[in-house]
Regions:
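Internal maturation/activation junctions in enzymes
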Residues: 2-78, 86, 156-157, 188-189
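Catalytic alpha/beta core of large soluble enzyme barrels
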Residues: 48-49, 61-68, 73-198
Length: 198
């Protein structure tokens, strides 16, 4: 899950890769179009972020070409926007929606109600696209339907899918964001969900 040791290692490894790729792209662009006018190699390379986040290959590319962009990495707020992104495609079916930032998904599902003029309103579950893709891939819809409206859907899902944002310990969440920040040179938009008794 997101807050497991393995999850944290994957987060760090992924961000290190993305950050180095972004900085290498900026350095390659500097080789083509010239570095930023305020770029100063000596001072730039002394920056703690550059020293810690970038690998030797990226630093070498910057040394050769300079850097086109002074700051590159940010995790912007994407709450509503995250619901319009194609996250997964399986055959002819598209799954729309991703996590809204550095947090895991907010919930595995929510309940919607259909309005009817005949007073036969119906309730149904709407699953996050990642969860729906899993349900479809492993043919779990009939099991979910058997649970009914009040059934515990999460009981048939793997634990890693049910580690939603409100289940993450707030202190652990801050620790994880600290590890993420190591590879981000601008800001991180983040929501930390706290239990009601805080």
């Amino acid at each position: 899950g997101y807050d497991s040791e393995e999850g944290t290692e994957i987060i760090e490894k992924t961000l290190k890769f993305i950050t180095n790729a972004a900085y290498q792209a900026s350095a390659t662009l500097a080789g083509e179009k010239g570095p930023s006018p305020i770029y100063d190699y000596e001072n730039y390379m002394k920056c703690p972020f550059i020293e810690e986040a970038l690998n030797d290959q990226t630093k070498q590319t910057i040394a050769e070409n300079g850097i086109r962009n002074i700051a590159i990495m940010s995790i912007a707020p994407t709450g509503s926007i995250s619901n319009i992104v194609l996250s997964y495609k399986n055959g002819n079916k598209n799954y729309i929606g991703v996590s809204g930032g550095v947090e895991p998904i907010f919930a595995t599902h929510y309940t919607r109600r259909t309005e009817s003029f005949k007073d036969d309103n119906r309730f149904y579950k709407v699953f996050h696209s990642t969860v729906q893709a899993y349900i479809d891939q492993y043919d779990l819809q009939s099991k979910i339907d058997e649970l009914g409206e009040e059934g515990d859907v999460e009981s048939i899902l793997p634990e890693f899918l049910t580690r939603t944002s409100h289940k993450i310990d707030s202190r652990r969440r801050v620790d994880i964001q600290g590890k993420i920040q190591k590879y981000i040179d601008h800001s991180i938009s983040s929501t930390i969900n706290l239990p009601e008794d805080v």
